[in-house]
């Protein structure tokens, strides 16, 4: 498959790895237990922003991409978005720690792992090193309403919160 585009259905049986946020496991040094997150099922009746990036704790991802979504979360919620999720090839432990390092609580933004970039590879949006590329997908009740892949690893425009908000 060569990416997703507006009008496509979100693929069936998409499963990510995820550690849910809990108060007792809220410290960055605490460790939760990964679970399967059945995205296709969970998002079937919701409005969702899924944005992906090459890796947790990396320069563009940590300095600009994630912080912009955190900052603009109230605006995103006001537009009727039920779920905001960030995706990378890192394992669920790293993604959980990255969410905590960014001060995200109560699953305000889901920090999901795409093990071996399986989903990203399935849509043709993984790089030659096996990492998720930088992209954004907006879903509304299982239908893609916006999908964009950045042209380069350090490019941040089409998957930015600012651009995605314009497409809600």
From Swiss-Prot:
Other notes on this protein?
The active site is a conserved redox-active cysteine residue, the peroxidatic cysteine (C(P)), which makes the nucleophilic attack on the peroxide substrate. The peroxide oxidizes the C(P)-SH to cysteine sulfenic acid (C(P)-SOH), which then reacts with another cysteine residue, the resolving cysteine (C(R)), to form a disulfide bridge. The disulfide is subsequently reduced by an appropriate electron donor to complete the catalytic cycle. In this typical 2-Cys Prx, C(R) is provided by the other dimeric subunit to form an intersubunit disulfide.
Q: Where is the active site?
A: 61
Q: Where is the signal peptide?
A: none
Could you tell me what this protein is called?
Putative peroxiredoxin prxA
- Identify the coding gene: prxA
Q: Tell me any Pfam family this protein matches.
A: Redoxin
Q: What does this protein do?
A: Thiol-specific peroxidase that catalyzes the reduction of hydrogen peroxide and organic hydroperoxides to water and alcohols, respectively. Plays a role in cell protection against oxidative stress by detoxifying peroxides and as sensor of hydrogen peroxide-mediated signaling events. Involved in osmoadaptation.
Gene Ontology terms: biological process: cell redox homeostasis; cellular response to osmotic stress; cellular response to oxidative stress; hydrogen peroxide catabolic process
Listed CDD domains:
PRX5_like (cd03013)
* Induction note: Down-regulated when grown with elevated levels of potassium chloride. Induced under oxidative stress conditions dependent on transcription factor napA.
Going by the record, the broad EC class of this enzyme is: oxidoreductase
For this protein, what is the EC number?
1.11.1.24
- Domain named Thioredoxin is located at 4-158
Q: Which UniProt keywords apply?
A: Antioxidant, Disulfide bond, Oxidoreductase, Peroxidase, Redox-active center, Stress response
The reaction(s) annotated as catalysed by this protein in its Swiss-Prot or TrEMBL entry are: a hydroperoxide + [thioredoxin]-dithiol = an alcohol + [thioredoxin]-disulfide + H2O
Q: What GO molecular functions are on record for this protein?
A: thioredoxin peroxidase activity
Q: Which family does it belong to?
A: Belongs to the peroxiredoxin family. Prx5 subfamily.
Q: Write down the species.
A: Emericella nidulans (strain FGSC A4 / ATCC 38163 / CBS 112.46 / NRRL 194 / M139)
**Self-association state and partner proteins as the record states:** Homodimer; disulfide-linked, upon oxidation. Interacts with thioredoxin trxA.
Q: Which domain of life is it from?
A: Eukaryota
Q: Name one GO cellular component term.
A: peroxisome
Question: Which PANTHER family does this chain map to?
Answer: PEROXIREDOXIN, PEROXIREDOXIN PRXA-RELATED
């Amino acid at each position: 498959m060569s990416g997703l585009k507006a009008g496509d259905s979100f693929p069936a049986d998409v499963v990510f790895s995820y550690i849910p946020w809990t108060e007792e496991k809220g410290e960055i040094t605490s460790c939760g237990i990964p679970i399967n997150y059945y995205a296709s099922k969970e998002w079937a009746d919701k409005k969702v922003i899924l944005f992906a990036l090459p890796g947790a704790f990396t320069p563009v991802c940590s300095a600009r991409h994630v912080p912009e979504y955190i900052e603009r979360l109230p605006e995103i919620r006001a537009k009727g978005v039920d779920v905001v999720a960030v995706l990378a090839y890192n394992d669920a432990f790293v993604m959980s720690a990255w969410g905590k390092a960014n001060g995200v609580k109560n699953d305000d933004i889901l920090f999901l792992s795409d093990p071996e970039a399986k989903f990203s590879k399935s849509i043709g949006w993984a790089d030659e090193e096996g990492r998720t590329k930088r992209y954004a997908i907006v879903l509304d009740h299982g239908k893609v309403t916006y999908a964009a892949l950045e042209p380069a690893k350090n490019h941040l425009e089409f998957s930015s919160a600012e651009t995605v908000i314009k497409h809600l």
